[in-house]
């Protein structure tokens, strides 16, 4: 009986891990060309405009992904955008300046394109002005499901690109320290 329960638990755990597994098929491939728009309405071409620096892209298709995406905001801000106040830091506060590109990319495709203007305005109104340089909008017919292996619309996806625009790491879902540690390891090694 114990063997059966253990086997069922093992299969269930494998199913859960597989369901939340990032898109490994994208790793090692060039990030597909994507034209986005920055906060000021100017075109930003991914990955062309990011070449020369490592890049972290956070991409979401729907408001259903917003909850998981929000779990990343503070850790990303604290690591890459915010500055440590030296007067309040103690000896254990270690801050490293990362020279990387960072973009949050809400994606408006298919039916969502019809509401993209109002959705963009809503996102802009709720976004801290300090984060405007890190916000891009994709508004297009192409979903990139095949190239980037997006499995769920209610999940945010994260891509680390090398200096040439090749995907070197992917993850998805809620923030956890292990995911951030892998991202930081890549940035620190390069």
Task: State each model region's role.
Residues 1-4:
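Positively charged n-region of N-terminal signal peptides that target proteins for export
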Residues 46-73:
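Short active-site neighborhood of thiol/selenol oxidoreductases, capturing the structured segment around
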């Amino acid at each position: 009986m114990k063997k059966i329960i253990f086997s069922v638990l093992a299969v269930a755990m494998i199913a859960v891990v597989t369901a939340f597994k990032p898109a490994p098929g994208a790793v090692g491939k060039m990030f597909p060309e994507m034209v986005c728009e920055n906060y000021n309405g100017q075109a930003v071409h991914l990955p062309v405009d990011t070449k020369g620096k490592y890049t972290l892209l956070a991409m979401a298709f729907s408001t259903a992904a917003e909850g998981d995406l929000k779990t990343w905001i503070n850790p990303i801000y604290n690591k890459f955008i915010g500055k440590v106040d030296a007067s309040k830091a103690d000896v254990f506060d270690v801050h490293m300046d990362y020279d990387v590109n960072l973009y949050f990319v809400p994606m408006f495709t298919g039916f969502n394109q019809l509401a993209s203007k109002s959705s963009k305005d809503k996102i802009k109104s709720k976004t801290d002005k300090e984060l405007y340089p890190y916000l891009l909008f994709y508004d297009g017919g192409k979903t990139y499901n095949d190239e980037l292996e997006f499995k769920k619309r209610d999940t945010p996806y994260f891509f680390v690109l090398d200096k040439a625009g090749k995907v070197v790491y992917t993850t998805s879902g809620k923030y956890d320290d292990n995911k951030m540690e892998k991202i930081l390891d890549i940035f620190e090694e390069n």
